[in-house]
Amino acid sequence: LTGIDPDRLEEEKRRGLTIDLGFAWCTLPSGSEIGFVDVPGHERFVRTMLSGVGPVRLVLFVVAADEGWKPQSEEHLAIVDVLGVQGGAVALTKRDLVDADRARSSERTVRERLAGTTLADAPIVACSSATGEGIDDLMAAIDAMVSVAPAPAEGDRPRQFVDRVFSIAGAGTVVTGTLTGGRLTAGEEVELFPGGDRARIRSLQTHKRRIETARPVSRVAANLTGVGRSRIERGDVLGRPGDWWPTDVIEARIRPVRGLTHPLSPRGAFTFHAGAAERSAKIRLYDAASISEDGAFVRIRLSSPLVLDVHDRFVLRESGRRETVAGGVVLDPSPPQRPGATAVDRLERRERAGREDIPALLLAERGAVRETELRSLTGFDEIPGAERVSGWWISERVRSIATSAAIELLTAHHDANPASEGSDVAEVRRAVADALRRAGSRADGGLAASIVDDLVQGGTIARYGSFLRLPSHRAEVAPGELDRLTAAVAAGEPTPPSVSELQRGGFARETIESAVRSGALVRIAPDLVLTPAFVERAVGIVRDAKGAGITVGDVRARLGTSRKYAVPLMEHLDRTGATRRSGDLRFARGT
């Protein structure tokens, strides 16, 4: 078909047996170019076969006419079936080694085996690579298969499944694999998942031709700078930075493969195969004690993280029996830590949903989603109809819970403390986070802070320094308390008690704040207040110095105070414009 021998290894050539993945390509009669991933057929290399077949959409299934259907043929068909390939053709090879009756018998057997699978209607073409018989017919069948196959999805979230990595002297690290989901361009920055290493694409090739942009679905070789070969392995994913969220726990529906001869129990030891990756896996059933032919919802814990997307298909093999036992579809690549009693209902909704519905479902499940999470979990940047708040997408329910919690806390605080300006910002944020947690929604501290800030910006609550209050609230100081406070400060001047000392003396913080707001006291520093009359005395002293100016030390001496008060007092006058500073001297405004 291609004129290319995909067997690279010396052992493969010596034994006439495919051991590792091989690659070839050709131009079809229609002019379309197609790439092949040659996967091992021997039963000992099924794991390698899975790493190559995972990302592909179309299958050329090979059965030798002289050897007939084999156990590995059955397992390969089961794998192809559960992966849901979008088209296929069957090559009945070695036609030259059998007579016509044997060829017809082999074809009937193959057709019977394909019944009820995704390849049930695939054309079967008898052919021989030795004589050339049927090769043109096989090429035409492949061309027809490609022409009717659905166009590959092309979004803006590329994902290249790495199935080979090597180094070239003078060029650096090269990764090859099947590209899906979006385009990659030479020169752009990329990330290798799940490890997180960043690199830059030096150059791209497909079918040994240099290209500037690679499109899905195609075989791509990416020459990378900034990352060494030892940092990459088969099963990794090459994508754009931040586009993917590696996971070691997923929720899915799995179904036993056709013809499984024993019950499928979650208690076995399994290997999980998706894309080009393989992981050990543990399975937990949600809605049944065993897995029936109709399948079951499951939670799968992987031995280490990998990159998975909603609707990705995967294969499960039972380690002890060394056989493929099930296939599945990823429904949630990043499920809640605690599934809860509604897990089945949630997964049923996800199973019915299209890809475009996933962002809204994610928001409904979590109540709030970070913008960065939305991109890496769904591939979308927006949630139609949802509200965006400081880097978060939030649901109406979360907005309502948070607003009610803030208003209830402030109302109770104002009722209990009428003289108080308000409640501490941190206290309101904690109340919002606690309310979200009790309601089963996300209770991230950053989310609570963002919502509280948004409530302030929207006018639902008001801010005064480090305090929050309802817009209608006005602090009410007990009659006579303000006069008693100002008298205490005046009596202590020129070295009055600090704010901390006043509070220890029985004056409420709210009373002191009220005095400052009303102008009964002047705050010259966070812990120092003075009477307006004392401040005006200082201004008069500076004014008396006229054009000669006056030092802080002279002001301190004339006031009879200490540097503890004189320095912040003069800095306060500078800030308010009553004085100006030139070197060590102060001058009254206008002099």
What do these predicted regions represent?
Residues 48, 72-79, 105-113, 137-145:
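Alpha-helical scaffold elements adjacent to nucleotide-binding pockets in ATP/GTP-utilizing enzyme cores
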Residues 32-34, 39-44, 53-105:
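Conserved Switch II/interswitch segment of TRAFAC-class P-loop GTPases
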Residues 97-103, 109-112, 124, 227-523, ...:
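C-terminal effector modules of nucleic-acid-centric enzymes and ribosome-associated factors
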Residues 95, 101, 112-260:
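Conserved catalytic-core segments of large NTP-driven translation/proteostasis enzymes
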Residues 1-47, 56-63:
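P-loop NTPase switch module centered on the Walker A-proximal segment
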Residues 1, 16, 38, 49, ...:
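Residue-level signature of catalytic and energy-coupling elements of molecular machines
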Residues 42-43, 65-70, 85, 94-99, ...:
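Conserved nucleotide-binding/hydrolysis micro-motifs of P-loop NTPases
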